[in-house]
A protein has these predicted regions:
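Mature extracytoplasmic/lumenal regions of exported proteins
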Residues: 46-170
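N-terminal export/targeting and maturation segments
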Residues: 2-75
Length: 170
């Protein structure tokens, strides 16, 4: 009786740990989905210089709250705080300081064992996604803290996306 109770209590951890490696194998090599190559983006956007010396400004505004950062007030209309990609609500995470219509969005859903988070680089002027980064994980609720945790295919997924965002259009 005790082992069954323990399994029922920890079922999401067991399922996430068992299923995630198979899902990781399915997604291996497919983490980055390219919609526009750097050359195509340059041609369509008219930007002929490198983005090497530009920065990505973190978007700190909470949905429904007025924006207070002068950078975001000045560039209002060049970005959208919320965008939908593949039916999922993505939140603005950063904006390029030189080309404020070039935005980064993220969708993180820790409420399902079969986690599939996405990060999108989007050109709001062209109304096109440049690329999408997929992060696969098995989410579960930590029994001690009650918070969401995961078994991720790539523990460095966020820094990998950040590096890709920084270097893709250089």
């Amino acid at each position: 009786m005790f082992p069954l109770s323990l399994f029922l209590y920890l079922h999401d951890i067991f399922l996430a740990e068992i299923i995630t490696p198979f899902r990781c194998e399915m997604w291996e090599g497919k983490e980055v989905e390219v919609f526009l190559t750097p050359e195509e983006w340059r041609k369509l956007s008219g930007v002929n210089e490198s983005l090497k010396d530009t920065e990505w400004v973190y978007y700190p505004t909470i949905e429904g709250q007025p924006e207070k950062d002068p950078f975001f007030i000045k560039n209002q209309g060049l970005y959208q705080p919320v965008m939908y990609f593949n039916g999922n609500k993505h939140y603005l995470s950063s904006v390029n300081n030189k080309y404020p219509y070039l935005n980064s969005y993220s969708y993180i859903n820790p409420t399902t064992i079969f986690g599939h988070d996405t990060y999108v680089l989007y050109d709001n002027k062209l109304k096109k996604a440049v690329f999408q980064y997929h992060s696969i994980a098995g989410y579960y609720t930590d029994p001690l803290s009650g918070l969401a945790d995961n078994f991720a295919c790539n523990e460095n997924y966020f820094s990998d996306f950040y590096k890709l965002q920084q270097n893709y259009l250089h």
